[in-house]
Structures are given as C-alpha cells and as structure tokens.
C-alpha cells in the first residue's frame, strides 16, 4: 500500500488502493456505508456534511456508473460538484493532469475523484496535491478501483452476512486486465474470505503473484461447485492484445455464466458483475436479470459506499 494513503495518525487521507488498507479502516468504511444505505439517506433528502466543499470528478476515461454514482454521493452530502470532461478541457491543448489538478485546487476544490487510463496516475496526482486535498481513485489502468471493491464487499455482506470465513468466492474471466479483480482480491483477503477461486483462460490470468493463495483453474464447471458467490468480469478488450481470446463465442462456451452452470454453484449463490455487462459473452440475460443477480444491488450500494468515503475524507 502506498504510504501517502494514511496520515501520521493512521487516518485515511486519500483512497488510492485497498492493498494493505488496515482491516479496521476497511470495516469502518463498510459499516458506515451500510448505515447510510439502511437509513435510506442515499435515496431521500440531502445532508449538509460537505456544504461549502467543492468536489471535482476528474475523469480521463469514459464512465457511466462510477461517475454518476460519485456525483450523486457528493451532491447528497451537500457538496458543490464539478464534472471535468477531458474531451472539452485544456488537456486537449497539452495541459497535464497535474496542472489541471493544481489549477482546480487553486480555485478551492478540495476533493478529487480521478479516473485515468495509466497505472499509478492517481497516486502521482495525490503526491502533487496540497495539504487538505483528498484524492479518490475511481480506477487507474489495471491497478485499482477501490470503491468498486468496497461496494462489492458491501453487496456480499448484504447477501451472505458479515462473516466471510466460510465464504467460497469465484472470480471469473479477464483477471489479468481487471483493476476490479485486484481490488476485490485485496479486500477478500483482508476480510478473511474462506476460499478464493480464480477461473479463466491462461492468457487472461496474471503472472505477477497476484493470485498467490487462490485456487486457480480453467475448468469453470468444476470451479463452480459449492460456490457462495460468483464475480463475473468483463472482457477488457480495450486493454487487450490481439489473439488473447480466440472468439467471443468460444469464450462464452467455456466461461459464460448460464442458468445451467449457475445450478452447479451453492444454493442461492450470489452473482456479481461490475459492469458494463457484455450480455451473451460473460453472462446470459437470464442470469443477469435473474433472482440470484446482485448487479443492480451493487449499483445501489455504490452510492452509499461513495458517500461513506467522501464523508470520511472530507467531512
């Protein structure tokens, strides 16, 4: 974990990664998010915790769920929200991300929610930020997507309870290119998940030690046996080299989640997907829209999680 994430007293200063985040901090964020969700604060009314605080969503990559979710979260805490669009900004004239941040900081912005295509870009911006400015990583390259990891854990707690010690979780698909998978793996380990299984083509599994301690395999049907939760991952075609997957049809045949396959998992196994979903590739319509799908619950939990993070960092 980057040392700049916590201050000298161990308090969260930025949220850049879930790797190495203390278990107590992780649980505090999840507990607070659960309180917000259960109190329906995220759906009705408006709080004034961040009144007078300016928050900017600084996105250098496209996003629907994450950006909208952060905007709503900040707005519902009473913040003034700015939405930065790289396509219409001075970055098209050559301005660096660092200069963009420093200029917005000079205008009084104190919270930055940053998405960037490059690994480590958000950490570099955090290093350049002034005292009292907080950065939240909304996804950088393949590295991390900490709030997605948090909302996935909140969704698992909601579906399966807070004790993860006997939980069997299967992460399926393009793990190699997935920042979500990395954040989920760090969180599951910190929370003491009983068994983490990782399944996908060899060409889409990382070889950097990330899967240490996991049960790894290519036989999806075998990996499903007795699973309590399935985390289906999107094929990150925008980050892939050609030829890693022979065809989408073959991928679906080997790794697509169908109702027949889901029946192999544990009774009432929860199905998660970070979105956007490639229907008919990693998951069928029947499963995505079925009774065991937690996809929309994940989206709803995202607002509560991001409110909890913003409140913790800026409140």
From Swiss-Prot:
Keywords: Pyrimidine biosynthesis, Transferase. L-aspartate binds at residues 93, 179, 234. Pathway: Pyrimidine metabolism; UMP biosynthesis via de novo pathway; (S)-dihydroorotate from bicarbonate: step 2/3. GO terms for molecular function: amino acid binding; aspartate carbamoyltransferase activity. Heterododecamer (2C3:3R2) of six catalytic PyrB chains organized as two trimers (C3), and six regulatory PyrI chains organized as three dimers (R2). Catalyzes the condensation of carbamoyl phosphate and aspartate to form carbamoyl aspartate and inorganic phosphate, the committed step in the de novo pyrimidine nucleotide biosynthesis pathway. This is Aspartate carbamoyltransferase catalytic subunit. It comes from Xanthomonas axonopodis pv. citri (strain 306). The gene is pyrB.
């Amino acid at each position: 974990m980057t040392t700049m994430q916590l201050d000298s007293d161990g308090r969260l200063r930025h949220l850049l990664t879930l790797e190495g985040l203390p278990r107590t901090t992780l649980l505090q964020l999840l507990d607070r998010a659960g309180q917000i969700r259960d109190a329906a604060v995220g759906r009705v009314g408006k709080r004034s915790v961040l009144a007078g605080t300016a928050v900017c969503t600084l996105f250098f990559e496209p996003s629907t769920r994450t950006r909208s979710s952060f905007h709503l979260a900040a707005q519902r805490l009473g913040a003034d929200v700015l939405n930065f669009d790289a396509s219409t900004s001075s970055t098209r004239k050559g301005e660096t991300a660092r200069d963009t941040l420093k200029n917005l900081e000079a205008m009084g912005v104190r919270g930055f929610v940053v998405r960037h295509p490059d690994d480590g870009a958000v950490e570099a911006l955090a290093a350049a930020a002034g005292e009292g400015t907080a950065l939240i990583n909304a996804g950088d390259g393949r590295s991390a997507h900490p709030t997605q990891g948090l909302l996935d854990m909140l969704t698992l707690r909601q579906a399966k309870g807070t004790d993860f010690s006997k939980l069997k979780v299967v992460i399926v698909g393009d793990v190699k290119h997935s920042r979500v998978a990395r954040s989920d793996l760090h969180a599951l380990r910190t929370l003491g998940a009983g068994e983490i299984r990782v399944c996908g083509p060899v060409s889409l599994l990382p070889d950097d030690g990330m899967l240490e301690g996991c049960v790894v395999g290519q036989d999806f049907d075998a990996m499903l046996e007795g699973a309590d939760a399935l985390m289906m991952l999107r094929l990150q075609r925008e980050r892939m080299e050609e030829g890693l997957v022979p065809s989408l049809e073959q991928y679906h045949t080997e790794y697509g989640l169908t109702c027949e396959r889901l029946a192999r998992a544990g009774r009432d196994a929860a199905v998660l997907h970070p979105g956007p979903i490639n229907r008919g590739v990693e998951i069928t319509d029947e499963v995505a829209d079925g009774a065991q799908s937690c996809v929309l619950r994940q989206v709803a939990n995202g607002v509560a999680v991001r409110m909890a993070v913003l409140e913790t960092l800026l409140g």
